[in-house]
Amino acid sequence: METHISCLFPELLAMIFGYLDVRDKGRAAQVCTAWRDAAYHKSVWRGVEAKLHLRRANPSLFPSLQARGIRRVQILSLRRSLSYVIQGMANIESLNLSGCYNLTDNGLGHAFVQEIGSLRALNLSLCKQITDSSLGRIAQYLKGLEVLELGGCSNITNTGLLLIAWGLQRLKSLNLRSCRHLSDVGIGHLAGMTRSAAEGCLGLEQLTLQDCQKLTDLSLKHISRGLTGLRLLNLSFCGGISDAGLLHLSHMGSLRSLNLRSCDNISDTGIMHLAMGSLRLSGLDVSFCDKVGDQSLAYIAQGLDGLKSLSLCSCHISDDGINRMVRQMHGLRTLNIGQCVRITDKGLELIAEHLSQLTGIDLYGCTRITKRGLERITQLPCLKVLNLGLWQMTDSEKEARGDFSPLFTVRTRGSSRR
């Protein structure tokens, strides 16, 4: 009975090749004609993103991608016209142009001249020459878009958001990180507050507004009223929002992840608003909010006890706050308390006693912890990642680290030990 691999049906070969990484898929196709035919089966390339340097004409490039059913493309360098890509990939599903600094409104305008119904995701992050003009083209011809990444596109204004709100009603995820000109007016457009001009993107599930410095609590009011299906909201580094704005968010029952990292005006009062509402958060980040203290941990334990991930790095918390929190947070999986310099071994002992489901903990820069506290933490049954960062070990403690379980990663400055 023949047992050689060459006797396998092409369908079985294709299933095997599907487990290979992209480089090995290509190598397998070069072995023989039978393997080449099997390796070109569309199931082998399902979900693969082609990463391309567009430098010179290659007539076989796009027919080859289409033959394998590849519909996701990342352009690493763009020295040819973008229209070359669009014309070559008739059924393109995802186009990643992040970091293509030479892409202009003119180049994008020549590429998008008719409706592209198949395109679902477009990434223009750090395409710094893009302006509202390009968003007009996108809103007109890419009405099926579900994901739009505009992080670092610093020339976009509220007018661009009005165009998005007018044309992209199917949008589910929008990243506007560091779009410095955006204000409450633009967020109002997205949330459907100007229905006479645009319906809004009312189906949004993820919205990133990181480092949009002009936003105030009014934006949060717009979001709470219009974007009621939002599941993830990133407001990190938005210095213009305050505790009062969190009162608007506190009744968004669909919200699961809220990032308030480095929002300087957020205090214990804001956390109280969140905890007293009807939120069902699974992730909360208030790192570097230096007005957040032990009282916030009491509020979190009272009203946000369903959290799976909690980040409190550099917050003004102590062992007392840890004691208030851990007794109600038994489902917590990730706890980041790096640079919380008031935490001692007592806090770690409380964590080890009550948070048995923890898989990761960040203790970076916790200068008052010792070997005794670490030994308790490393006994957590589910722990996979322990970040010690800049914690200074004595020679004896470095030797003791060798006794830590090999089942999790110990990270210190410049190292990662498993």
Swiss-Prot record:
Assembly with partners or alone: Part of a SCF (SKP1-cullin-F-box) ubiquitin-protein ligase complex. Interacts with SKP1 and CUL1. Interacts with SNAI1; the interaction requires the phosphorylation of the two serine residues in the substrate destruction motif D-S-G-X(2,3,4)-S.
Gene Ontology molecular function: ubiquitin-protein transferase activity
Name the UniProt record assigns to this protein: F-box/LRR-repeat protein 14
Residue intervals passing through the bilayer: none
Gene Ontology annotations of biological process type: SCF-dependent proteasomal ubiquitin-dependent protein catabolic process; ubiquitin-dependent protein catabolic process
GO cellular component: cytoplasm; cytosol; SCF ubiquitin ligase complex
Induction info: Down-regulated by hypoxia.
Region (Required for down-regulation of SNAI1): 2-48
Task of the protein: Substrate-recognition component of some SCF (SKP1-CUL1-F-box protein)-type E3 ubiquitin-protein ligase complexes. The SCF(FBXL14) complex acts by mediating ubiquitination and subsequent degradation of SNAI1.
Biological source species: Homo sapiens
